[in-house]
Amino acid sequence: MKFSCEKHLLQAAVAAASRAASAKSPISALEGLLIEAGSGVRVTGYDLKKGIYMNIEADVAQPGSAVLMTAKLFSEMMRLLPDGIVTVEVGDDSRASVRCGQSEYGFMALPAADYPELPEVDESEAVRISQKALRSMIDESIFAVSTNESRPVYMGSLFELEGGRLTMVSVDGY
């Protein structure tokens, strides 16, 4: 696999996907990010409960896929690279390199086959909502989301779709 893209694009994708990657997992691949290069590049983070992927434009010289280091470390590495074109390459021997300007990092990658597949989203259950409306819903209910980790069921919001109406409920347990 080999591709090149603007640093800010890859950095944004890595930052987004890193939010879903597992910090500690018995499946070591879940601590990293799955990078897939084809017509563009997809960066995926997944912890078996939540998954985030982001597609970016890139010049793909050699299609392929691999799992690159821990998400946290990869995110930090992206932050330290100078602005410009980043080239990511993973050879058949699983040696990976990331180059940008005068900076170059080398490390070992894991095979993409080690990364569990994200469940497919059922498009029949999809909802389209404007960013402004969703932001308003979140702003009006976020205060009620619990931060108490001993009761994780209250650490999120419930979205219900009934008769074309989307309702969002947040509760902190009180």
Regions found by a protein language model. Name each.
Residues 1-174:
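Structural preference for solvent-exposed beta-strand-turn elements
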